């Protein structure tokens, strides 16, 4: 299994994320984080919300994979508990997660993905990545009946 988290952000590897990456390997899952922040995003965010959203889509589109499940994290999307999240992931070998910038996703991009919400609350990119990585590890623990999820 391979899970990739694509994010509109300048940098990533947080210590806790590295721990979850290591823990996911025991289940045969490579957990990868890819931060994308081309110059056009910084410029677009200064101009308008619509242009910013378009720039996020342009950054993410090359990573949409028709042979994977593509999941856009969106605060207004479907949400569920850890068991529902594990059910959603268990039948896929390739899973791509997308975390937009401050202005969110274009509707067009959301139509190319399955949308999922971590919470009704708004998180910084760093916190969202940590929560997502922990939930991926928890989902794997549920799938493989590991005692981490009690």
UniProtKB/Swiss-Prot annotation:
Alphabetized InterPro entries for the sequence: Alpha/beta_knot_MTases, RlmH-like, tRNA_m1G_MTases_N
The record's top EC class is transferase
EC number per UniProt: 2.1.1.177
Against SUPFAM superfamilies, the record matches this protein to: alpha/beta knot
Q: Which UniProt keywords apply?
A: Cytoplasm, Methyltransferase, rRNA processing, S-adenosyl-L-methionine, Transferase
- Per UniProt, S-adenosyl-L-methionine binds at 71, 100, 118-123
**Reaction equation(s) it catalyzes:** pseudouridine(1915) in 23S rRNA + S-adenosyl-L-methionine = N(3)-methylpseudouridine(1915) in 23S rRNA + S-adenosyl-L-homocysteine + H(+)
| Subcellular compartments | Cytoplasm
Q: Which GO terms describe its molecular function?
A: rRNA (pseudouridine-N3-)-methyltransferase activity
Keyword flag Transcription:
no
Entry GO terms, CC: cytoplasm
Its biological purpose is as follows:
Specifically methylates the pseudouridine at position 1915 (m3Psi1915) in 23S rRNA.
Which family would the database say this protein is a member of? Belongs to the RNA methyltransferase RlmH family.
Assembly and interactions? Answer: Homodimer.
The record's listing under HAMAP family reads: 23SrRNA_methyltr_H
Q: What is the name of the protein in this document?
A: Ribosomal RNA large subunit methyltransferase H
Species this chain originates from:
Helicobacter acinonychis (strain Sheeba)
**What is the taxonomic lineage of the source species?**
Bacteria, Pseudomonadati, Campylobacterota, Epsilonproteobacteria, Campylobacterales
Q: Which gene holds the coding sequence for this protein? A: rlmH
């Amino acid at each position: 299994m391979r899970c990739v988290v694509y994010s509109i952000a300048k940098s990533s590897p947080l210590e806790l994320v590295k721990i979850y990456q290591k823990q996911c390997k025991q289940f045969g899952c490579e957990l990868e984080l890819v931060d994308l922040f081309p110059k056009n995003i910084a410029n677009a965010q200064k101009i308008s919300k619509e242009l910013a959203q378009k720039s996020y889509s342009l950054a993410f589109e090359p990573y949409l994979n028709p042979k994977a499940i593509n999941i856009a994290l969106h605060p207004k999307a479907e949400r569920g508990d850890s068991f529902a999240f594990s059910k959603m992931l268990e039948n896929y070998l390739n899973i791509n997660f997308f975390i937009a910038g401050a202005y969110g996703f274009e509707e067009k991009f959301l139509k190319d993905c399955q949308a999922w919400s971590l919470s009704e609350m708004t998180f910084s990119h760093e916190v969202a990545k940590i929560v997502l990585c922990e939930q991926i590890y928890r989902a794997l623990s549920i799938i493989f009946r590991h005692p981490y999820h009690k």
